[in-house]
UniProtKB/Swiss-Prot annotation:
It comes from Homo sapiens. The N-terminal region is required for orexin signaling. Residues 1-24 are annotated as: Disordered. Belongs to the G-protein coupled receptor 1 family. The gene is HCRTR1. Residues 68-82, 141-160, 236-298, 361-425 are cytoplasmic. Disulfide bonds join 119-202. The antagonists suvorexant and SB-674042 bind at the cognate neuropeptide binding site that is situated between the transmembrane helices and accessible from the extracellular side of the membrane. This is Orexin/Hypocretin receptor type 1. The lineage of its organism: Eukaryota, Metazoa, Chordata, Craniata, Vertebrata. GO terms for biological process: cellular response to hormone stimulus; chemical synaptic transmission; feeding behavior; neuropeptide signaling pathway; positive regulation of ERK1 and ERK2 cascade; regulation of cytosolic calcium ion concentration.
Length: 425
């Protein structure tokens, strides 16, 4: 992991402290106990870090598991966008369950305790999860861009989404093989290597100093800078399309005010009083679709923004360290250590933030989360069902929804019919 300032290189008995007896038989054991007591045991602020990691671990695992269950058990939620959201949740579960505990131990002890094999596997899975997350967010942005800005150019289907997800994992597993190839485990204190794994480090080993500069420059561009730039342009066009233009066939006053319940009745009466009911229903359906697309776009923009903010510190620090060679002789070691440690925590916090975003910005996910928690926590109310509603109840709900949505159009139709009957002889 990245905060690896060579622990043990600065170790030794501090000046002014009592020197140990000259090489007693148990000198190495005493030395290890000294290091554990004065160096490895978590400090007060590190206990705060441990608590933060535990909170992220619980929220990320529970939240992303609920996201997967909600889509799996509800056929009406199996949309193209939700398929990609589930894939993002699977990547978050992977990195949380496997990589987070190892990262926490490395950040606290500054030692790699998991041996040579996992030194290659865990960083490799970490890099794969980053690639999967970036590619998934890119495919979501591309799908929304086609659906909203160019609906006639490409038809997105669930089958194509599943194929894209398989391609995302295949590409990510392939392009991150160099990350596993260069990882090696070594001991800072070779004389203690046979007795303890403390002060072992898992770091990259390159044949030439130029290779890591090229690799990490490309890694930063491919997994962060270029995708975020393209996604920002896509969402900018989506924003202009959804918020900058009116619905075709309607007046601008209606489009500006359709979200305001207090003005909706008057505007609809003014704009639709001369239209028959089918056109009014078509207009309301168009407004409903516009509202749903705006909510989805808003949620996805927030997910992308949080991802960019959470991955920005570690991306910049990696470039500074690997490309420009900084932090090798850091004068303020504690500050550098704190920066890397916090940046690691932010990466995992992003995995916990996504389900929270879905809960606040998606009514369907919020309903499923509430149903799941009501089953586990009786105090929250009656236990709901995570399964999709029956056809009869769904039809009844749809009928009630249509009735509420069309109540205003019925008022307009009543005004039209009244005026017609008064004019007729």
């Amino acid at each position: 992991m990245e905060p690896s300032a060579t622990p043990g290189a600065q170790m030794g008995v501090p000046p002014g402290s009592r020197e140990p007896s000259p090489v007693p038989p148990d000198y190495e054991d005493e030395f290890l106990r000294y290091l554990w007591r004065d160096y490895l045991y978590p400090k007060q602020y590190e206990w705060v870090l441990i608590a933060a990691y535990v909170a992220v671990f619980v929220v990320a695992l529970v939240g992303n598991t609920l996201v997967c269950l909600a889509v799996w058990r509800n056929h009406h939620m199996r949309t193209v966008t939700n398929y990609f959201i589930v894939n993002l949740s699977l990547a978050d579960v992977l990195v949380t369950a496997i990589c987070l505990p190892a990262s926490l131990l490395v950040d606290i002890t500054e030692s790699w305790l998991f041996g040579h094999a996992l030194c290659k596997v865990i960083p490799y899975l970490q890099a794969v999860s980053v690639s999967v997350a970036v590619l998934t967010l890119s495919f979501i942005a591309l799908d929304r861009w086609y659906a909203i800005c160019h609906p006639l150019l490409f038809k997105s289907t669930a089958r194509r989404a599943r194929g894209s997800i398989l391609g995302i994992w295949a590409v990510s597993l392939a392009i991150m093989v160099p990350q596993a190839a260069v990882m090696e485990c070594s001991s800072v204190l070779p004389e203690l290597a046979n007795r303890t794994r403390l002060f072992s480090v898992c770091d990259e080993r390159w044949a030439d100093d130029l290779y890591p500069k090229i690799y990490h420059s490309c890694f930063f561009i491919v997994t962060y800078l270029a995708p975020l730039g393209l996604m920002a342009m896509a969402y900018f066009q989506i924003f202009r399309k959804l918020w900058g233009r009116q619905i075709p066939g309607t007046t601008s006053a209606l489009v500006r005010n359709w979200k305001r319940p207090s003005d909706q009745l008057g505007d609809l009466e003014q704009g639709l009083s001369g239209e028959p009911q089918p056109r009014a229903r078509a207009f309301l359906a168009e407004v409903k679709q516009m509202r749903a697309r705006r909510k989805t776009a808003k949620m996805l923009m927030v997910v992308l923004l949080v991802f960019a903010l959470c991955y920005l510190p570690i991306s910049v620090l990696n470039v500074l360290k690997r490309v420009f060679g900084m932090f090798r002789q850091a004068s303020d070691r504690e500050a550098v250590y704190a920066c890397f440690t916090f940046s690691h925590w932010l990466v995992y916090a992003n995995s916990a933030a996504n389900p929270i975003i879905y809960n606040f910005l998606s009514g369907k996910f919020r309903e499923q989360f509430k149903a799941a928690f009501s089953c586990c926590l009786p105090g929250l109310g009656p236990c709901g069902s995570l399964k999709a509603p029956s056809p009869r109840s769904s039809a009844s709900h749809k009928s009630l929804s249509l009735q509420s949505r069309c109540s205003i159009s019925k008022i307009s139709e009543h005004v039209v019919l009244t005026s017609v009957t008064t004019v007729l002889p």
